[in-house]
Regions:
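A flexible loop/linker signature enriched in serine peptidases of the S9 family
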Residues: 57-60, 77-87, 101-107, 122-150, ...
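Bacterial Sec signal peptide processing site at the extreme N-terminus
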Residues: 19-32
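Residue-level detector of Asp-centered blade-edge/turn motifs that repeat once per structural unit
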Residues: 68-69, 114-115, 178-179, 222-223, ...
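Hydrophobic beta-strand positions that form the internal "hydrophobic ladder"
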Residues: 73-74, 119, 183, 227, ...
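C-terminal motif of bacterial Sec signal peptides marking the signal peptidase cleavage site
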Residues: 15-17
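Multi-bladed beta-propeller domains
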Residues: 39-60, 91-106, 154-170, 199-214, ...
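Beta-strand-rich domains and repeat architectures in extracellular enzymes and scaffolds
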Residues: 37-42, 51-83
Length: 362
């Protein structure tokens, strides 16, 4: 789900097979965008970061995830002239940015396959070429759950597009186990927003969660044995009624999300944060015994999102970033030290979200 852009804007807004569209060339950088990456110094309190390298500058760029070889990133972006997100790849120096999605509809949540010969992502393009409508914010701060989202895989050059899911309702938020055997994703195929796994070809779908409420944003642990995710399970009758009414309209209210973990087969579910805030984008640290995630827990206004780490036992919460705006979508490369995240810091245009690379310092 495309969280960053909705956060930033709000904070300060049946086919048997797929014909292969011709990949489009992304728009050229605007004159105000940096043509090459640039160094940015972290805040003095950000002691886990070496020098930051800003890989993008201009538009909205987020959810950047490493290839299995650790030499490329796949990410989603709304660049100049685009109405909504498409999927791009780039080298770790920010060069060779190429669009790999169709250029139609809205896309989200891309991830490399083992061997880096495929990329999985969600797209609405089968429902039409236009961007789907943004949420009606008269209902408050809400996220859209686009029923037109299905999962696809594509070659890194944008060819050989293949559909993986074809169920009624939302299928998105897919990532792949480091072991290379299963895709984990969020789906509404059974009437609620739950987490499922499947084989890399879309077969053998298994449901992992069944509690009322939203379960999503899943990632595997380094050994593939566990899954970390974000969740909101309403229990109060009014909260349940509100959740059900919004979901019927294709919306959810994400003001309170906690971080959970479970075994890769769905057993032993445990809540590991209790912050009463919007906590999301969890990712396992290389050791496998801590989680890094984004949350607005440190800001009474709920507008500033920073990165935090916490033990899988729920102990040892540590704040990592101190930017006054948005920091989110953290991920470690396979080498365990190269680190990527997305932020509003140091941008050329206020509110833009960009991709940053750094070396993690323990």
């Amino acid at each position: 789900m495309r969280l960053t852009l909705i956060l930033v804007t709000s904070i300060m807004t049946i086919v048997a097979g797929c014909a292969q569209p011709t990949p489009q060339t992304p728009p050229a950088p605007s004159p105000t965008s940096a043509a090459v990456p640039r160094a940015v110094q972290p805040d003095p309190q950000e002691t886990h970061f070496g020098e930051l390298v800003m890989l993008t500058d201009g538009g909205e760029n987020a959810e950047a995830y490493f290839s299995f070889a650790g030499d490329r990133l796949v990410y989603q972006a709304t660049k100049e002239g685009m109405g909504c997100d498409q999927i791009f790849t780039m080298k770790l120096d920010g060069t060779n940015q190429k669009m790999v999605s169709t250029g139609s509809g809205r896309t989200t949540c891309a991830y490399y396959y083992p061997g880096d010969d495929w990329i999985v992502y969600a797209s609405t393009h089968l429902a039409g070429p236009d961007c789907p409508p943004v949420p009606d914010h008269s209902k408050g701060y809400v996220w859209p759950i686009y029923a037109a989202y299905d999962l696809f895989k594509v070659r890194p050059d944008g060819t050989d597009l293949q559909q993986l899911t074809d169920s009624p309702g939302y299928d998105a938020e897919a990532t792949i186990s480091p072991v290379g055997d299963r895709i984990v994703f969020t789906s509404m195929r059974d009437g609620d927003l739950d987490i499922y796994t499947m084989n890399l070809d879309g077969s053998d779908v298994r449901r992992l969660t069944d509690a009322l409420g939203y379960d999503g944003g899943p990632f595997f642990s380094p050994d593939g044995a566990k899954i970390v995710y974000r969740a909101n399970h309403p229990t109060d009758p009014q909260e349940i009624a509100d959740y059900s009414a919004l979901l019927a309209d294709g919306l959810i209210r994400p003001s309170k999300l906690e971080i959970w973990i479970m075994n890769a087969d769905g057993s032993d579910k445990r809540q590991i944060t209790d912050l009463g805030a919007a906590s999301f984008a969890p990712f396992f640290m290389p050791s496998g015994d801590r989680i890094i995630f984004s949350s607005n827990t440190g800001d009474p206004s709920g507008r500033e999102f920073d990165l935090y780490t916490i033990g899988i036992d729920g102990e040892g919460l540590e704040r990592i970033t101190y930017s006054p705006e948005f920091d989110g979508f953290p991920m470690f490369a396979p080498d365990g030290t190269t680190f990527v995240f997305c932020s509003n810091r140091s941008n050329s245009t206020p509110g833009d979200t960009n991709v940053f690379l750094t070396r993690w310092i323990d």
